[in-house]
Amino acid sequence: MAFDSAAEGYERARPDYPVELFDDLIRHTGVGSGDRVLEIGCGSGKATRPLADRGLRVTCVELGPRLVARARAALAEYPDVEVVHSSFEAWRPPDAVTFDLVVAATSWHWIDPGVRYRKTFDLLRPGGHLASWSAAHVFPHGGDPIFRELQDVYDEIGEGLPPDAACPRPGELPDLRGEIEATGLFDVVSVDQYDWEVVYDAEGYIRLLDTFSGHIAMAPWQRERLYAEIRRRLGERPDGLLRRGWGAVLHIARRRGA
């Protein structure tokens, strides 16, 4: 599992999700202190902590053993958080427990499409909610040109983008509304996009890239060439910084049926 090899860097390098996202999640789902939450693929616990801070009881299911260890250490102060080492597909709750909310933060797309909606439906109480979102790169008008400028390096090392690659603007990320409705298992409650910016120096940005599956899979020489060029180009800037736009689409859906 590629992400597991980057367990330590994941917590440090990946961006925190906006506070507004969690506020809206609570408002739209109505969950409150003491309610049961299942988090699919918690990683290092980026989304877990804000949920636990709001008094929710969270069971986290994580496939990567290093990420499990990292999450357990990071979340040790929360007695109502449990981190289980398992794939979501294989995991079974104890004693037929059901949940008020199932959360998938930058993990939903990794779950078997033939399993994820049906199993989530089965794990939720009637009227319970599914909340899923992913953090993605967005490209604002007038944004940092370095991402376009670095494409020649990606091309050189054989990792260039196809000509029709999407470069979404803030507010333009695709959503899963149609996919959710097509299951017949859930009613869409809300779909909201959140956009924010993170400023990186060269080493911080390289740490971020080291958590992406495509960069993890590169040959060492490819990473060395790319990272050397990032250091060189940012070193030529007066402040030595780049600005990366992030976006996330929060989907909230209510379980149908009694």
Question: Can you say where each PLM-predicted feature lies in the sequence?
Answer:
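Conserved beta-strand/loop positions that form the S-adenosyl-L-methionine
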Residues: 40
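Class I SAM-dependent methyltransferase SAM/SAH-binding core
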Residues: 36, 44-91
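Conserved Class I S-adenosyl-L-methionine
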Residues: 44, 168-258
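A short acidic, Gly/Pro-enriched loop at the edge of an enzyme's catalytic core
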Residues: 92-102
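A short, conserved alpha-helix within the catalytic core of class I
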Residues: 111-120
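Short catalytic micro-motifs in class I SAM-dependent methyltransferases
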Residues: 106
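Conserved catalytic/acceptor-binding region of the Class I
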Residues: 121-195
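Conserved class I S-adenosyl-L-methionine
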Residues: 1-35
